[in-house]
């Protein structure tokens, strides 16, 4: 649940929000948060009615025991980070299959990057899992949609980026 008076409407329209994530399978993975910077993610997809949200959890993650962590692990074998994307996958019908295909590739690809040879948790492809997102505006709670809770593509620690590396997006 994203908690704030309004959601970001376009890339660069950053909102500071609080909220919570409830893991329906493993309650210990649930968390609350405050002071998160929420922005629209995606250059072309920012114009869709259903937005992708890049979230920088600046205030950390408060676990069910009340402990605050600066980073969060999507899975037990993941690299912890504090920036994630809630991806709507509006333009494609694959939805969570995008993530599952990337996981299959990750598991079967015989080629490893130099960072992966040093740390097997480093990824070449995206990872995440399906969630539903709601927005609480201070008065009402609205269903936003089915999303994927993904690593953000610009998290250097997840993908093994190093100082001087460049990442290009061709449109």
Indicate where each model-derived feature is located.
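Phosphate/dinucleotide-binding and metal-coordinating scaffold of catalytic cores
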Residues: 1-171
């Amino acid at each position: 649940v994203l908690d704030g008076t309004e959601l970001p409407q376009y890339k660069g329209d950053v909102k500071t929000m609080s909220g919570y994530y409830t893991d329906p399978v493993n309650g210990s993975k649930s968390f609350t948060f405050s002071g998160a910077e929420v922005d629209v993610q995606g250059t072309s997809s920012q114009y869709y009615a259903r937005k992708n949200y890049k979230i920088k959890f600046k205030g950390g993650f408060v676990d069910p025991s009340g402990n605050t962590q600066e980073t969060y692990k999507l899975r037990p074998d993941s690299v912890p980070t504090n920036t994630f994307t809630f991806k709507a996958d509006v333009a494609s019908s694959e939805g969570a299959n995008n993530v599952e295909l990337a996981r299959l590739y990750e598991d079967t690809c015989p080629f490893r990057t130099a960072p992966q040879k040093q740390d097997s948790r480093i990824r070449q492809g995206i990872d995440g899992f399906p969630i539903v997102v709601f927005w609480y505006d201070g008065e009402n709670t609205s269903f936003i949609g089915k999303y994927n809770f993904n690593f953000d593509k610009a998290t250097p620690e997840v993908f093994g980026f190093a100082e001087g590396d460049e990442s290009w997006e061709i449109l």
